[in-house]
A protein has these predicted regions:
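Conserved catalytic core of two-metal-ion nucleotidyltransferases
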Residues: 107-148, 280-327
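Arg/Lys-rich, intrinsically disordered low-complexity tails that mediate electrostatic binding
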Residues: 448-498
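Long C-terminal interaction/binding lobes of large macromolecular proteins
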Residues: 142, 171-174, 199, 375-378, ...
Length: 498
């Protein structure tokens, strides 16, 4: 309990300890100081011009903003997360040509009279940061053309600027909440924003006839593949995982939605081992016609995967995660089974919406997302069993800042002979338009060398100039002496005659 003598109004709540009160005061001070710093930037007479150049560039190029700036744009005024009067806008946007766009935008600022401009690679490969007069103006992130086109198509247009749609924003936040090995200090802020988007943009699918196009797997094949995945500690996130969540669905008649399993979807860091185990177990059942197709990752949205077909029917997808996703371990028929958390499943299902492939039924995916959210909201924060949400463990690699720096260092050694190439700049761009212009001018300056004359026959053997001058002087003196002697002789001669 806080001492009664404490006068600070932040400490009037009975449940606050003295330490809690200290932290509340500290947080308020941090917020106030940040506000003062932001106001200094916003009062800069050049800042409005800087911002106008940026927003016009985004409009003209039809780039797609994401992150906090997009969340703020799609929320109503009463719930916006940024204030236009006290917060510096933080523009993060996608581009299918991020490197060239970063340079082009830097050049525009330079032509408009700004001198201190720097476009440089971020820690994350494919992201470029732009600074103008030492103010961070933008983060430009590369997005492969097919995904970028899909984001453009689904984007929300506000005042001529494109922002990622609410489903993408939910996906990105669920992805961060599923990464229990990442920066969990951001979770509170991320979860608050997630709830705001969910409040104004809930899943509205009615889930009618979601199984109309489902062709269930034969029972023996389904059981064999499921057990092989359990044996290899895979994490379930498809229909089998949904069947575990469906036990908590209200009303009860909705629980049969996931009884016909279309296919098994799992996460594994060793997909090849699972594939071999599945083949082995199916062969033991006398099933031979097995085909495996490999699908490359789609940007950083959907990881590389393997599609398993039996008798030309798809039975399973095995995804190899490129980041850590949390899951719960539950007991099913005396077996420990790994089931992806709600956030892990949401991050994948919502990402599938942007792939535009026939195996991903948009309406069914939206229905499953709605059911997951409803289950969680109806659980009264049970937070046990499969309903645990913010938990370890997680499956997949977790790349720390140190890991990324090590990777960049090894890339620098690999690419040091390719400086100036696009491949090099993707990792190590450091572009300053003013310095670049100086380099270009210097490279075109003609170096004038002293003119060397080819010696001619008449001058090739001449005495050096200094010696010739000295010799001439001596000749004049000698000539003068001869004249004096001649005159003296004349005088003496005439004298004798007189």
């Amino acid at each position: 309990m806080v001492n009664e003598n404490v006068k600070n109004k932040l400490c009037v709540k009975d449940h606050l300890t003295f330490e809690d009160c200290e932290m509340a005061i500290l947080r308020l001070a941090i917020k106030e100081n940040a506000k003062v710093d932001a106001e200094k930037v916003l009062k800069n007479p050049n800042f409005n011009k800087m911002l106008s150049i940026l927003t016009n560039f985004i409009r003209r190029k039809k780039l797609v903003c994401y992150g906090g700036i997009a969340i703020n744009a799609v929320l109503p005024d009463e719930d916006k997360i940024y204030s236009t009067e006290t917060d510096i806008p933080d523009y993060d946007f996608f581009s299918s040509n991020a490197l060239d766009d970063a340079k082009e935008l830097a050049d525009i600022y330079y032509k408009e009279g700004f001198q201190n401009i720097e476009a440089k690679s971020g820690v994350h490969v494919g992201t470029f940061k732009l600074f103008v007069d030492y103010v961070a103006m933008a983060d430009i992130s590369y997005m492969p053309v097919p995904l970028f086109n899909m984001l453009q198509k689904q984007a929300v247009n506000v005042d001529g600027i494109l922002y990622t749609d609410p489903n993408y924003l939910k996906m990105a936040m669920a992805l961060e909440l599923s990464n229990s090995a990442g920066d969990v200090t951001r979770w509170e802020k991320v979860f608050k924003r997630y709830k705001l988007i969910e409040k104004y943009y809930p899943f509205k699918t009615k889930c009618n006839d979601v199984n109309r196009n489902i062709h269930p797997i034969a029972d023996n094949i389904y059981e064999t593949i499921k057990n092989a995945c359990i044996d290899k500690n895979a994490v379930f996130l498809g229909d089998y995982a949904m069947s575990q969540y469906s036990q908590y669905i209200q009303p009860h008649n909705l629980r049969n939605y996931f009884k016909p399993v279309a296919d098994i979807d799992v996460l594994s860091e060793e997909p090849e081992e699972i594939i071999e185990r599945i083949k082995e177990m199916l062969n033991n059942e006398g099933i031979q016609n097995i085909k495996v197709l490999k699908h490359d990752a789609l940007g950083e949205l959907v990881p590389m995967s393997y599609q398993i077909l039996v008798n030309n029917d798809t039975c399973a997808y095995i995804y190899k995660p490129f980041r850590c996703h949390n899951y719960n371990v539950i007991d099913v028929n005396h077996q420990h089974v790994n089931i992806a958390t709600i956030d892990t499943i949401l991050s994948f299902y919502l990402a599938f919406l942007y792939i535009n492939k026939p195996q991903y039924d948009t309406e069914r995916l939206m229905c499953m997302c709605k059911i997951l959210v409803d289950v969680y909201n109806q659980s009264n924060l049970a937070n046990n069993g499969v309903l645990k949400r913010f938990e370890l463990p997680c499956i997949g690699p977790q790349h720390t800042l140190s890991d990324m720096k090590k990777e960049k260092n090894s890339k620098f050694i690999e690419l040091k002979g390719k400086k100036g190439t696009k491949e090099y700049d993707m990792y190590f761009l450091n572009y300053n338009p003013g310095q670049q212009q100086e380099k270009e001018i210097n490279s075109h300056v003609v170096q004038i060398k002293p003119r060397t004359r080819t010696p001619s026959r008449s001058t090739s053997n001449k005495t050096p100039f200094s010696k010739r001058v000295l010799r001439t002087k001596r000749r004049r003196v000698a000539s003068r002496n001869k004249t004096y002697k001649h005159k003296a002789r004349k005088l003496s001669f005439f004298g004798k005659r007189l």
